Amino acid sequence: MCLVMLSHLDSPELRTLTQHLWRWNYGATGVRIFFVISGFLITSLLMAEKQQTGRISAKGFYWRRALRIMPAYYSLLLVVAVAIPLELVQAQIRDLLAPLFYVSNYWQVARELRHTWSLSVEEQFYLIWPCCLIMFGIRRSALGALAFLAIAPVLRILDQNPGWDNQAFAFETMADVIATGCLLATWRDALWRSSTYRRLLLARSFPALPLAICVLAMQLPNLIIWNACIVSVLNIVIAMTIDRYMRCATGPIGWALNSGPIVWLGSLSYSPYLWQQVFLENGRYHWPTLFSLVAIFCVATFSYYVIERPFLRLKNRLSPAAINR
């Protein structure tokens, strides 16, 4: 979430810094981390439900997802709809249609709502993956996800649209990122039984691996090579990094990830992500960076405690503890 917000900063006082850092492509990396974590968590929850109850309830899953995601999301769309006639945003009423139906990863929308493409990809994943697990089982679904990882680089090369950056936002070219997280959840225990994997994951030099992959990606000017190879490698390294710090949260990084402020920020992260674009990339007003950041976290905190939390309590009452999120 922080990486994405940093990539959206467009203020005069920070423009030199952000333009210098942009070459690291940290915004896209932040979204990839989010997708891998999402695939891992959702698959883990569904597998826990299967183990606990003997089955996966599609109805229960969609109720839980709706209560978790939609209240705050549609509150954002409602606020933008009210702001349009007041000329507080650049968006038009037509820009609300694609986000309303979670398809803004295929249609270009105004700057204030452009970030909803990632939530559209996420929602499309929710529609497909639980059904795969129910119809085909965990093992065959995992094999299907693995096959998709193999063909995704080819899809990224073929899916080029000069009028809109479809390659970066389309479900078919981004789903392998989520699938990597799904495979981590499915094969995590089996991977841990491999001594080679354990040694790599627990090596003191392991934290240098993600950085090395990012540096390598920066140095490759050939877009075809990037699409065919490095993106997939980056997805795998993100998954390995998640596994590493879940199993062995030691050192400065582990301490930071488990610190109180970071844990609190993690619980709050959905709301800042929802509201950041309205302030950081407002098409009509360019507010000072500090004002925008304070406004984002004030609105996000209100959204979390007033809108999200009541629905989260309802979600928790509808679900066994083992399958809550």
Task: Describe the predicted segments one by one.
Residues 28-31, 48-83, 98, 120-126, ...:
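Transmembrane alpha-helical segments and their boundary/interface "anchor" motifs
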Residues 28, 178, 182-183, 205-311:
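Alpha-helical transmembrane segments of multi-pass integral membrane proteins
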Residues 19-31, 90, 109-121, 160-180, ...:
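Interfacial loop-to-helix transition and helix-capping segments at the boundaries
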Residues 1-48, 70-72, 101-104, 121, ...:
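Functionally critical transmembrane alpha-helices in membrane proteins and complexes, commonly lining
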Residues 43-51, 82-86, 134-139, 183-193, ...:
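Structural signal for the C-terminal ends of transmembrane alpha-helices
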Residues 2-6, 40-44, 78-82, 123-138, ...:
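Membrane-interfacial alpha-helical segments at the cytosolic side of multi-pass membrane proteins
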Residues 2-10, 82-85, 103-106, 148-158, ...:
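Aromatic-anchored segments of alpha-helical transmembrane domains
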Residues 123-151, 185-204:
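Solvent-exposed interhelical
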